[in-house]
Amino acid sequence: MSTFRYKCKQLDQEIQWWFSGTGNRAFWKFEKKLAELHEWYWSLALDPFPYSGFFYKCFYELFQLWVKLGLIVQVSYLILLLDFFVYTIPKKMASQIETTVEKVKQSGIPADILRKRAVDYWKKNNSHNSQMQDVLPNVDEIYEGMRANIAKYLGRSSTVTSIAKLGKCKVYRKKNIPLANLPSLQTSCVPITLTEESVGNSDYTTEETNSEVKSLHVGAIEIVMNSFASSDCNILGGFLLIDTCHTDINNAIRSIFVAPMRGGRPIRMISFPDTLVQIEPNMNKRFQLLCTTSNGDFMQGRDLAMMHVNVLAHAVTHTSTYTPTPYYEKILSREKGFIVEYLNRMTYAVHNQNHPTEKDLLESDFQFDFEGQPVLKRISSTKAIFSKGSSFRYMISGKKEHKIDKPRLEEDGSKSYIDGLQDTFDTTHATLQSGADLFKRNLDDVSTISDTMLGAMIGQTKVVIPKTLVAGTVLKSGPLSDVMQQGSFRSTIALQRTHIITGKIHVVAMLETAVNTGLGLAICFNSGIRGKASADIYATCSQDAMIWNPSCTKVMQYAFNPNPCSDGWSLAFLERTGYHCVVTCVTGWTGTPLQDTFMTINWHISREACVPKIYTIFDPEPDMMLNRWMGRAIFPQQSTQVVRRMPLSIGGGAGAKNSILMNLPNAILSMWRYFKADLEFELIKMSSPYINATIAFFVAFGDLSDDTVNFEAFPHKLIVFSDKQDRTTISFSKDEFLMAWSTQVRPDTKLSEDGCPYLYAITHNGVSSSVEGDFILGIKMVGLKAVENIGVNPGIIGSRLLGAVAQSGQTQQVWNKIWRIGTPPQATDGLFSFSIDLLGVELVTDGQEGAVSVLSSSPVANLLRTAAWKCGTLHVKVVMTGRVTTTRANWASHTQMSLVNSDNAQHYEAQKWSVSTPHAWEKEFSIDICGPNRGFEMWRSSWSNQTTWILEFTVAGASQSAIFEIFYRLDNSWKSAGNVLMPPLLVGNPRLDIKGRAAAAA
């Protein structure tokens, strides 16, 4: 106050002179001085007031009088004011309220008071649905401050409508700024004009402009659109509000609006950008509206709508900023915007929330790279050059991988997911308009099932676990569709009536076991099953499987895609394709429990999107999922070292003598002669948690004896298994191998002549525990990376229990033998007929005695039988060899071949050949295998009425045509997906001589 009094006295003499006659000549100086005093005084706490010379003199005299009254009078006056506002007024108000309450008690509530309040409430909340007024928020709804409140009290507004008049702590509010008309194009762009004035450096030369204001905080934008289309049209408009200062689409898209483009009433889109915009010539290009329509029936070249915009913003300087209201900060900024709904129109709005996460921080690199200006350096008196200036480099980097393995039974149900927007938008605060006609509430809604784990639950299975359980026991086996036919869960009906489900099937298995025992269980999923298929873990786990030890992991979760060819599935798809589920025991109880128990399996529809898993044979993927069960490594509790070895030539099947087990990944890998790759293994502990061990893993040749003393001289990986550790993974780079190795090895090959690498597992120290039992590890080869394949493999009879991998496409001309059929020497009427299912690898004859057939378990034959879905070109070659005892002059044999796509007589022939060449001939043709599941076809499936290809033979003079051999070759475009559980395949391949007699295999 003393500072103010001093300045007033300082200016008093000048003011007295200005009011004199001579002061009229300097009236403009008076106004300027008064403005300085006004700005200085109100900058203390108040907002500017309307001033003039007379107003100032009166104010000054009153102020001087107040000062002269003295401190005692001032305090007395303030006490009187305090008594009036604190005591007198509340007492009178309480008296009036008490009188009103007494009247209500005596007379009751007036009859029309509730009706009036209801009418007022309806008008307040529904007026925007019936009136075409602007809905841009008021200034006090967005910004607050003492300066604005005092200005409002004094009758002066702190709001301006021109950028040129914008000053510190001012609010810019401009309505009806015209925009360019919206053209009728497939996609159009309309800049959002924030000011009608041209903003540039020249604007700041005027006296009215406040040069301190450099930016605007854009609080609200209302886009008003009047459509020229018919009021009864069905055109839907989609609008994207874009911030052009961002190049990343996740940051650029601020809001999405969808609304009908019918004429009549305007479309009003409100957005709250909450963004600081620099005042510069291109500020009107900062925000742009991208528009498109659902159909293009409006005439091209014509304008579809006229548009204008209303803007509310606040000036921001280096010394002052805005203060948002709690309503704006907690409600409007969170909702981001909305569409005004007129006459129950269907409207929809969603807004981007692209906030950084912990993962973004950990995976970001902040690199500082500063190069100084070149420096002129003198070399000599006649020469100088520019040399490089000083430089500065520094980088801040987080971890490249940040993975948290945390079991979770309940998914986060707080987010709302909108189809088509999951990848870009966090729709936690998406706003659906109120009313009966919501954007997504249609009777023809075909969207997928998306809910919480409880809401998306489709089934529950109880599996009895007996107390006497050994490895290989099948606990449950059957179609997966049977599990999902239970009608007592929330999403069961939705599952039965939804055409396309894009989420994976989420499985949660729970089993309580004692900690002093161990158990290995597996739940396996395969695309099909044929005949008396084997349920061995080698065959069942190759497609999708969860293998775990319940003693270490009480709750096991797994998600899989039942349609490996596509990103969607349905219940009818599971039923008609025969998708199969097997629950099997991998390792029995290591300690016998007292009673039987049971396991509970819950089935849910996951929010995780389905991803296809397709194997490309001759142009394979960089990362190949294998799921090849290598076997169990058992380490007993003893004082001596135990050695376990597993071959890495993984192209053959698994099984006993004269029969093998085969699955799709191994059949694919066996197509190559040699291979080399990075190997990744998963180690699963299957014994009691109290039995621990330290195991060393390394790769070496298989002929190392068990008593080798320097095993750990090889480069090895030392794994320490703790009490509760269930599993871990190890990997070996292909750089550790000198060269590639064979995918298949003959079963009679000695280890010293093998020449292929083996995976070794040896005990680093002894296994000991107070609990009885062995330390058991289940080993699975998860996948291969950066695979190199060399050559094509024709196959080996009964190749050793090994496996193979493939990569890098090649043109191959190597044929695989499939069938060898010998005709009967004494055919009835000289005729013999048979048919071959080319895709199912099956043979049907007319049943005559003397006919002999042999099926070769070659790589292509195994691939066709184990692959559920096939796509590509199959090349077939038929070779006939006649009996040499028949002379050329006496040759009278004739063969007729017909190619049909079904064994039903109602199907027409696709191709037909007649061959009568004596003694020997061959015929080659190709078939394009294509189907309804994104080009993939399933053999003999009732789903989409899928069939097969049949090659029918009718041989006249069968005694002369002794042997028919069928060979296959796959085209470079061949693809396969999904595994079929098969019975054990015979590997015996006796040869026939040209007289039809069986010969010993060489």
From Swiss-Prot:
Keywords, alphabetical: Capsid protein, DNA-binding, GTP-binding, Host cell junction, Host-virus interaction, Inhibition of host innate immune response by virus, Nucleotide-binding, RNA-binding, Suppressor of RNA silencing, T=3 icosahedral capsid protein, Transport, Viral immunoevasion, Viral movement protein, Virion
Segments of this protein annotated with the region Involved in tubule formation by the movement protein: 392-398
InterPro entries, A to Z: Como_LCP, RNA2_polyprotein, Viral_coat
GO function terms (MF aspect): DNA binding; GTP binding; RNA binding; structural molecule activity
GO biological process, one term: transport of virus in host, cell to cell
Site (Cleavage): Q433, S434, A806, Q807, L985, L986
Presence of keyword Membrane: no
Sequence segments annotated as region (Hydrophobic): 46-68
GO cellular component, one term: T=3 icosahedral viral capsid
Residue spans crossing the bilayer: none
Name by which UniProt lists this protein: RNA2 polyprotein
Organism: Cowpea severe mosaic virus (strain DG) (CPSMV)
